[in-house]
């Protein structure tokens, strides 16, 4: 959600800024801009729409400079207009900002009384004027930034330049990700590693309260008390190839097809250990796991559906009660506290604000034990968690999550079995059986991917519909939820999901010949119940699209379409059945001509409320 990039070098940084912003497009945005210091003066270009349009304007205007900053904006305060796009300028001070300033109205009134004139509706312009005000009082750029942020309430990542100090720029972080890229005689800042990987693999992650001065010959970092500090240097393992499309039409399609490999990578430690030791979740995990009496899962969106799936595994395999809650709801209610419950947070980015704040709230309430499941090392959520387990999905560029979801499921399954083994609920024979199911999973997922041509044919039918209903039972109900979410996210077709047994309690009223009904029907203990629910749909003239196992014994007929996956894959069946619903959403969006990787109104990393 929004993106920042800045650079200072002995070369023209405009191509670096443009390429960095293109790498940040996946986060979601509606406008973009860059500002450079050229011959001591600020030059700025902003556009609504795609980064490519802004880049053309910058080229036509002959932008070239050794110092500059850029931004992709996802509108929060103020509409999608060029005036509201970043960078924002105040009397020779120019900045870009991610986050939300909660007290911007108070500051706006104060600054207006001092004679400042506002050109936009944004909260960001307040910060530019505040910094200029403090420079007028005698502070240098860094000091003015440090004074300004003390007056702000909210979250922010900032990069700031001034015509008065053309040999450096400064930045600040509070609640929003920001990193510094360390190059050879050049330095960069960005909200995401993908924006700097073109120039360097060496990065420093700023912490909340940090400010920094960035020069060609070095950097200086200061903590919230304005004392100089050292932050650790990290070598990123992100590759440029992982950020490129290769042979695929969209990143979402690429990421769907990467799942056999990333699932194998994520389960590698368990396979190498020939079991499910607590060590998979950190050195302290065994002592923590032995003392817990329940699990509380907090997550948002797709990660929440991963948590719902995990509840079935944790309760059935480990014999522990498991509660799953949407993070944005949990943090605003007086929640029940049991210090012996393990709080598990799930976030692809590790920066999801509602999940981060829910974790802080849980800790403040008295929850002592926390585990984060995340795809981004050194992000905010893992930094404040007691235990950490990283998925190994690699960069996920498509806004609609695919491989991050299935790798989360693998980690959650490993958690359920590890707890079960430790508690004596899983014996050696069953542990070996679970491990074998895990080994076979990448092959099962690949077989599901081989169904793509059949699923693409279904998409031709779905593309002309306005609504869809997804049904599942037990372990596969959360997969129905995920299928409905994917379809609505990228094809803009209204889709809902229900437990199949709930049809007669309301949703059946919606069923007619124009409502396609997707059913996830593996050959498990609930199959006959699902078949009965399907008959309820057929009796009302509904058209059924069924994802079934090879041995589920469905026969196609008018109004009943069936695609068969491989034979039933036990408790890991939800992962295999995830692939078809991802492909159905993708190909339906393709037929409808929507922007698959950047669906309207959505952002990849939701770092605001």
From Swiss-Prot:
| Subcellular location, record wording | Cytoplasm
What InterPro entries does the entry give?
GATase_2_dom, GFAT, GFAT_N, GlmS/AgaS_SIS, GlmS/FrlB_SIS, Ntn_hydrolases_N, SIS_dom, SIS_dom_sf
Alphabetical UniProt keywords: Aminotransferase, Cytoplasm, Glutamine amidotransferase, Repeat, Transferase
Q: Where is the Glutamine amidotransferase type-2 domain?
A: 2-217
Q: Which residues form the active site?
A: 2 (nucleophile), 604 (for fru-6p isomerization activity)
For the SIS domain, which residue ranges apply? 285-425, 458-599
The record's GO CC annotations read: cytosol
Stored Pfam families: GATase_6, SIS
Name the PROSITE patterns on file. GATASE_TYPE_2 (PS51278), SIS (PS51464)
Q: Which GO terms describe its biological process?
A: carbohydrate metabolic process; fructose 6-phosphate metabolic process; protein N-linked glycosylation; UDP-N-acetylglucosamine metabolic process
Record-listed E.C. numbers: 2.6.1.16
Q: Which GO terms describe its molecular function?
A: carbohydrate derivative binding; glutamine-fructose-6-phosphate transaminase (isomerizing) activity
Q: Which reaction does it catalyse?
A: D-fructose 6-phosphate + L-glutamine = D-glucosamine 6-phosphate + L-glutamate
Summarizing the function annotation, the protein's role is:
Catalyzes the first step in hexosamine metabolism, converting fructose-6P into glucosamine-6P using glutamine as a nitrogen source.
Q: How does it assemble?
A: Homodimer.
Q: Which NCBIfam families match?
A: glmS, PRK00331.1
**Protein name, UniProt field:** Glutamine--fructose-6-phosphate aminotransferase [isomerizing]
Source species: Xylella fastidiosa (strain 9a5c)
Q: Which gene encodes it?
A: glmS
């Amino acid at each position: 959600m929004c993106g920042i990039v800045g650079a200072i070098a002995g070369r023209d940084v405009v191509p670096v800024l443009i390429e960095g912003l293109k790498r940040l497009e996946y986060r979601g945005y509606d406008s973009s801009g860059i500002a450079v210091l050229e011959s001591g003066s600020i030059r700025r270009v902003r556009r609504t729409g795609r980064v490519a349009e802004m880049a053309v304007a910058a080229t036509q205007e002959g932008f070239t400079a050794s110092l500059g900053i850029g931004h992709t904006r996802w509108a929060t305060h103020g509409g999608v207009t060029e005036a509201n796009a970043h960078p924002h300028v105040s009397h020779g001070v120019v900045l870009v900002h991610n986050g939300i300033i909660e007290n911007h109205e108070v500051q706006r009134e104060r600054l207006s009384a001092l004679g400042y004139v506002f050109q936009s509706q944004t909260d960001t312009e307040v910060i530019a004027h505040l910094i200029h005000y403090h420079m007028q009082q005698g502070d240098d750029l860094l000091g003015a930034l440090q004074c300004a942020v003390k007056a702000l309430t909210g979250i922010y990542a900032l990069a700031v330049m001034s015509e008065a100090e053309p040999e450096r720029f400064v930045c600040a972080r509070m609640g929003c990700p920001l990193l510094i890229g360390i190059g050879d005689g050049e330095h960069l800042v960005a909200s995401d590693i993908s924006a700097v990987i073109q120039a360097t693999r060496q990065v420093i992650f700023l912490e909340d309260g940090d400010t920094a001065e960035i020069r060609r010959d070095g950097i200086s970092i200061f903590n919230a008390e304005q004392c100089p500090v050292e932050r650790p240097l990290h070598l990123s393992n992100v590759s440029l190839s992982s950020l490129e499309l290769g042979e695929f039409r969209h990143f979402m399609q690429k990421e769907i097809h990467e799942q056999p490999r990333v699932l194998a990578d994520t389960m590698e430690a368990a396979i190498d250990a020939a079991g499910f030791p607590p060590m998979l979740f950190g050195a302290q995990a065994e002592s923590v796991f032995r003392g817990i009496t329940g699990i509380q899962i907090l997550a948002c969106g797709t990660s929440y559906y991963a948590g719902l799936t995990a509840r079935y595994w944790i309760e059935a395999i480990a014999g522990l009660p498991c509660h799953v809650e949407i993070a944005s709801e949990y943090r605003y209610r007086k929640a029940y506290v049991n210090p012996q419950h393990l709080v598990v947070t799930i976030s692809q980015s590790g920066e999801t604000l509602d999940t981060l704040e829910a974790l802080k709230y849980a800790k403040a309430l008295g929850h002592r034990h926390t585990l984060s499941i995340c795809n981004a090392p050194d992000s905010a959520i893992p930094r404040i968690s007691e235990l950490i387990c990283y998925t190994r999905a690699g960069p996920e560029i498509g806004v609609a999550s695919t491989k991050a979801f299935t790798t989360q499921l693998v980690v959650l399954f490993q958690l359920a079995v590890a707890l079960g083994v430790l508690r004596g609920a899983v014996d050696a024979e069953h542990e070996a059986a679970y491990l074998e199911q895990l080994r076979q999973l990448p092959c099962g997922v690949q077989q599901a991917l081989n169904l793509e041509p059949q699923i693409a044919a279904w998409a031709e039918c779905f593309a002309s519909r306005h609504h869809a209903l997804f049904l599942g039972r037990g372990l596969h109900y959360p997969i129905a939820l995920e299928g409905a979410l994917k379809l609505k996210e990228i094809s803009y077709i209204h889709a809902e999901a229900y437990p199949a047994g709930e049809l007669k309690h309301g949703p059946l009223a919606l069923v007619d010949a124009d409502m396609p009904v997707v059913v996830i029907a593996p050959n498990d203990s609930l199959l006959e119940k699902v078949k009965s629910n399907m008959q309820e749909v057929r009796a009302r003239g509904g058209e059924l699209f069924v994802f079934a196992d090879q041995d589920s014994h469905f026969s196609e007929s008018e109004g009943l379409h069936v695609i068969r996956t491989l034979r039933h894959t036990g408790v890991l069946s939800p992962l295999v059945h995830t692939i078809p619903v991802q492909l159905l959403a993708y190909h339906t969006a393709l037929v409808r001509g929507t922007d698959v990787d950047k669906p309207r109104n959505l952002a990849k990393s939701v770092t605001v409320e």
